[in-house]
Amino acid sequence: MSAPLIDKYRKMATFDWKKLKAAVEGEEHVRLKSEVVAKMKSEPVFHRDYRVLSREEQREVVHQRWKKIVEWGLFKDPYSDLENFHALTETLEAYDQGTSARLFLHGNVFGAAVKSMGTDRHKDLIQKTENNEIVGAFCLTEVGHGSNTAEIQTTATFDNGELVFNTPSVSAIKCWAGNLAHSATHVVVYAQLHVEGKNEGFHGFVIQVRCPRTFQTLPGITIGDMGSKPGCWQGVENGWMEFKNHRAPLSALLNKGCDITPDGKYVTSFKSASEKQSVSLGTLSVGRLGIIAKGMMACTFASTIAIRYSVARRQFGPVKGAENEIPVLEYPLQQYRLFPYLSAAICIRIFQKKFVGHFTEYMMRVIMGEKSDELSEFSKEVHALSSGAKPVATWLGVESLGEARKACGGHGYLQMSRLNTLRDDNDPSQTFEGENFMILQQTSNILLGKAQSIGSIETPMSTMSFLNQKPSKFSSWSSNPVNDVLSAYRYLTYHLLQTTSAEAYRLKASGKNSFEVRNEIQIHRAVNLSVAYTEHTMIHWVQQFLKEIEDQSVKPVLQKVLNLFSLFLLERHLATLYITGYASGGKFGEDLREKLRLAVAELKPEAIALVDSIAPDDFILHSALGASDGKAYEHIMEEFRKYTNEQPRWVCDLAQFLQKRSQGSKL
Amino acid sequence: MSAPLIDKYRKMATFDWKKLKAAVEGEEHVRLKSEVVAKMKSEPVFHRDYRVLSREEQREVVHQRWKKIVEWGLFKDPYSDLENFHALTETLEAYDQGTSARLFLHGNVFGAAVKSMGTDRHKDLIQKTENNEIVGAFCLTEVGHGSNTAEIQTTATFDNGELVFNTPSVSAIKCWAGNLAHSATHVVVYAQLHVEGKNEGFHGFVIQVRCPRTFQTLPGITIGDMGSKPGCWQGVENGWMEFKNHRAPLSALLNKGCDITPDGKYVTSFKSASEKQSVSLGTLSVGRLGIIAKGMMACTFASTIAIRYSVARRQFGPVKGAENEIPVLEYPLQQYRLFPYLSAAICIRIFQKKFVGHFTEYMMRVIMGEKSDELSEFSKEVHALSSGAKPVATWLGVESLGEARKACGGHGYLQMSRLNTLRDDNDPSQTFEGENFMILQQTSNILLGKAQSIGSIETPMSTMSFLNQKPSKFSSWSSNPVNDVLSAYRYLTYHLLQTTSAEAYRLKASGKNSFEVRNEIQIHRAVNLSVAYTEHTMIHWVQQFLKEIEDQSVKPVLQKVLNLFSLFLLERHLATLYITGYASGGKFGEDLREKLRLAVAELKPEAIALVDSIAPDDFILHSALGASDGKAYEHIMEEFRKYTNEQPRWVCDLAQFLQKRSQGSKL
Ligand SMILES: Cc1cc2nc3c(=O)[nH]c(=O)nc-3n(C[C@H](O)[C@H](O)[C@H](O)COP(=O)(O)OP(=O)(O)OC[C@H]3O[C@@H](n4cnc5c(N)ncnc54)[C@H](O)[C@@H]3O)c2cc1C
Ligand SMILES: Cc1cc2nc3c(=O)[nH]c(=O)nc-3n(C[C@H](O)[C@H](O)[C@H](O)COP(=O)(O)OP(=O)(O)OC[C@H]3O[C@@H](n4cnc5c(N)ncnc54)[C@H](O)[C@@H]3O)c2cc1C
């Protein structure tokens, strides 16, 4: 076993991984990313080992790294320099989500909120934000309210030309705001605006919270940290904040579409509270696209680490003798457990990139001031799809890391595998920017709203058009599994829409109110509807990408990847396919599963090269089990040797204790 | 919201939770556990907060706690004082698996191995082990071998009346041995025994590795730590060990059934290498029953924390206004996500307790020296069931903690919820004492071995008897969901056995060797077979327990619990039920899912009282979200307030940096 086995596996592939990478990610993106990586490698502050840092240490390194990135001046505005922005973002997200959260929350959450809700009077602040002269945080969540943002309880009361902020109860204390506990000088904060004794509802404000020199909090503001957190979020200073008659100037009100006149009258151009709220929170939906990428990245890490390790790891063989043991990657079961996430890493990337393209077009039209029915349809569709894709991608991502850990056996549990930490890092992606089950309701609500217009559904991204045709049941398999899968998804989505909608009617007719109805149709119906619609779109978009791909040399392997991805997803709906009547008889399911097993097996010779095409640089990957040289044992032992012959101070106490026990027993 | 809502939910229950607890756990067990808890509460060394300790700190507290427990003299031998042993074990496991590992690895793994493989010449060592004059570790795993223990490469060579230990390669370095890195004075170590130039195969040895006074390693031995690990295992000093001509006396050989004569001849009474190996590793299967309990405990923690929090957490409501918001436990979807694990916590406990009963009977017969065909059938059946139940229970356990975290929204991600840490704590239970997918193969191998004797299968625990009758397809639902579920499982298991066995034949006939055949029948077939067999037994045993229960007042609620557990498990096989032909047509699946939703809903009024009946004492639970007083927000804020106005030292640097940015922009 002198030359690592991984080289043998590299040679099995039918394609050139660099070409595949270029085809999927774009050459420029690949080049820009490697520039960022080179920059990071050359800076000692980005170097790291496998020790677990304390809360204090972790935050200090995040601070140092953040400073470096700001100094580099690389972190550009997404709209002025899209390519650089994506390259930097992706690299940082892969390197450490804590560090990237530090930058994002300031620029893309705090900054974007001020920009989108503010007016000319906030220009100076926006300037300072872009120039990193201040540090921003985003304070929406309260101890008692996260998902139900409309009911947050912090108050901002107009008084004598100023705004007075208060926290009326424990559950109104702001919390979870990243950057807040130690660094923020300014925050965007949401509160109920009271003017002349009337609650004008949910509004966004921007206020200063600390003196930028002493970092003391301003009068009437108490800020604290939330204590320990898992994974990389230990390095993020999520804070809580309590107001007691904190006075801020009137300019704190982010006054696009509403204002308070100098003589203290509230005026607004919003037609309804919900219109105002949707503008106030509009910036949040942008974030969802970024979170889809977190899911993709999780699948990327999981499959890279576990598949490379599965080549180095040999266990059992056809005949006795350690020399006859085979790499665990050879076991069909091991492949079945890992390859679907490899295919997901690639397909979600392709899907997400296309989605970002659509979204950018949408945003451009919004920024240009377009007001049209089509644009509002566009907004709805973006909302439906992002609210479906964020849960699907993040659930897959977290699941993939759990499975990868198990597939690496005991060594997967070492800190240096990084798999448990990565799982903890990604865990909250299922919750923030919209709790997954909550936003799936948004997708199904929009779809259910279309149930009446079947036959004439038209949307800008055409993700719902297939619902116009009554789909037919399964008749036979074609030679193209992806087409077969898409047909099944169309039937599934259509039928789930029909049955969920019918169930809602039935419940309404039985006297339930719309709140009860919505709650009662979720399980097995609305939830599955949202997921089926989303997965259909994902698969369909990747299929389109494949049709348009220029480099024909990588098309066959991508086809294999998509075959697996689509069969893997569909198999999870097999029971529902039977229930909705798409097929009957055992053979359909048996066939589907056989096709799935086949699709898994077909990826085996390509697996290591596919991993090479998605894996981040070793420096970013930072996993003893997943390094590209395939020398897992060497890396493991290198780390082990650092802890040779350790004698913690309590061993003395142990020696005395054993001594005492032994004397005791002789009495 | 002055009186916590939890009290209202407590009153909804139809039963007395204390009676339920006594019925399920036994009064004596409940009493003994509360004695242990009281003892722990009174000792400051067992107090803890929510900070994450460093590797060094965590190990030091484990050492201190271990000392206290040894001083109490509570940790008795399982066979001489079963009740006390179980009460202590369960309490410690719930308190911190790291601390309990410290005790277990010494007494129940190291000690048990010496006892079972050793002879009279090891009596003194056993005495010292029981008296805690030495510290033991168990060294089986090597860097290159875990699952395939037969191929471990460490050698023990007979030379001049002594045994010489060597580590021939990097992959032969012992690793993962708990207690080894700092504390162990002695270890049981497995190696290939070479006598007169011949490899006599895999043997167990017990050797001293450190001086008990200086704790220096003995000549020819290098020991180190494995660095950082996740969760409570950070507190466990899993170590690695390398031999270079380490000489030990001949008495190191654990010589039950084999020996080396004074003149250097190897003698053995074992008939085959596999017989020897199964005796050498026999002690391991005992452990599996303990690991099933880890899965149960994980479900217990997950459902306790998430269900109690779901009552305190109110979000959304039928009409606007924070005062109209309802506890998230009211949402059918939230119930659907959590109640199955509550039912699993209770049912797995009942199953595991019964299994321990059977196992104890089995061990008694072994210890009495019985040698019979029936006993060897017993051994096989215990092996099949424990190899199935350990995966089923630990997968459910880890899954439950992940779902519970998500169900607690953002606050679930705080360290003080304990959910992520508990997930990390439980994660390796899926891997150690037999990697889950590996041992499922043992279950299916045993079942497949029975395929030929259908009609006359008889085993001591009768878990396979149902296979003797050809089961019939679904005809209609009865009034008892558990009976319906069991019928479905019988059909499922029977058919999976038939089809898996047929597939194996087909592959063999096509020229594949038995290694290939075994690998190729796993996915969708052998794996599902093992799981179905195990789940059938679990449900069946709980049903039997219910039939025999004395306290009739708790029977109805336990019936609800079992209804849910069995429907929940079966629903996961719905697609396979269709494939195997148990049912056809959408209605069957729709009905099954409706029954499942109903079973979930029926548990709602009982949920909090059920949680009370399984929840460990608050001191042990140690979760701000899950405390029995239902005051989650108060506990969260109490912790938050500890971190008020923190100013880490780097904030100075940040202030200067912002200052510089601002000056720069003005130039
Ligand atoms: C690491 C991290 C960073 C964060 N950063 C920020 C930040 O910078 N700024 C900020 O303002 N916030 C931040 N948050 C907060 C985050 O946005 C919220 O936690 C998130 O929106 C989820 O809301 P919640 O916690 O209220 O969940 P909850 O709504 O309390 O969810 C709890 C459970 O109830 C269920 N549930 C709730 N309502 C319903 C319903 N109607 N039907 C069915 N089920 C329901 C949910 O599905 C979930 O299972 C952060 C959170 C985390 C974990
Ligand atoms: C926290 C912890 C504590 C431990 N404590 C101890 C201890 O005290 N003493 C000790 O000796 N050991 C200990 N161990 C080691 C543990 O026993 C092994 O890790 C465990 O047996 C799994 O073996 P492995 O790591 O070799 O997994 P591997 O066998 O390497 O498994 C890797 C992957 O390969 C797959 N695979 C392997 N063979 C096959 C096959 N034939 N077919 C299909 N798939 C296959 C597995 O399913 C898995 O997905 C500990 C481990 C941990 C994590």
Curated annotation (Swiss-Prot), chains A, B:
It is an enzyme of class 1 (oxidoreductase). Its main location: other. Expressed in intestine. Pathway: Lipid metabolism; peroxisomal fatty acid beta-oxidation. Gene3D superfamilies: Butyryl-CoA Dehydrogenase, subunit A, domain 2, Butyryl-CoA Dehydrogenase, subunit A, domain 3. FAD binds at F138, C139, L140, T141, G146, S147, G178, R313, Q334, Q335, Y336, R337, G410, E435. It is found in: Peroxisome. It catalyses: IC-asc-C7-CoA + O2 = IC-asc-DeltaC7-CoA + H2O2; IC-asc-C9-CoA + O2 = IC-asc-DeltaC9-CoA + H2O2; asc-C13-CoA + O2 = asc-DeltaC13-CoA + H2O2. GO terms for molecular function: FAD binding; fatty acid binding; flavin adenine dinucleotide binding; pristanoyl-CoA oxidase activity. GO terms for cellular component: peroxisome. Its cofactor is FAD. A motif (Microbody targeting signal) lies at residues 665-667. Its EC number is 1.3.3.-. InterPro entries: ACO, ACOX_C_alpha1, Acyl-CoA_Oxase/DH_mid-dom_sf, Acyl-CoA_oxidase, Acyl-CoA_oxidase_C, AcylCo_DH-like_C, AcylCoA_DH/oxidase_NM_dom_sf. Keywords: FAD, Fatty acid metabolism, Flavoprotein, Lipid metabolism, Oxidoreductase, Peroxisome. SUPFAM superfamilies: Acyl-CoA dehydrogenase C-terminal domain-like (SSF47203), Acyl-CoA dehydrogenase NM domain-like (SSF56645). In contrast to other acyl-coenzyme A oxidases which bind to and are activated by ATP, does not bind ATP. It holds the Pfam family ACOX_C_alpha1. GO terms for biological process: ascaroside biosynthetic process; fatty acid beta-oxidation using acyl-CoA oxidase. The active site is at E433 (proton acceptor). Involved in the first step of peroxisomal beta-oxidation by catalyzing the desaturation of fatty acid-derived side chains of ascaroside pheromones, which regulates development and behavior. Specifically, shortens indol-3-carbonyl(IC)-ascarosides with 7-carbon (IC-asc-C7) or 9-carbon (IC-asc-C9) side chains and contributes to the shortening of ascarosides with 13-carbon (asc-C13) and 15-carbon (asc-C15) side chains. Belongs to the acyl-CoA oxidase family. Homodimer. This is Acyl-coenzyme A oxidase acox-3. It comes from Caenorhabditis elegans. The lineage of its organism: Eukaryota, Metazoa, Ecdysozoa, Nematoda, Chromadorea.
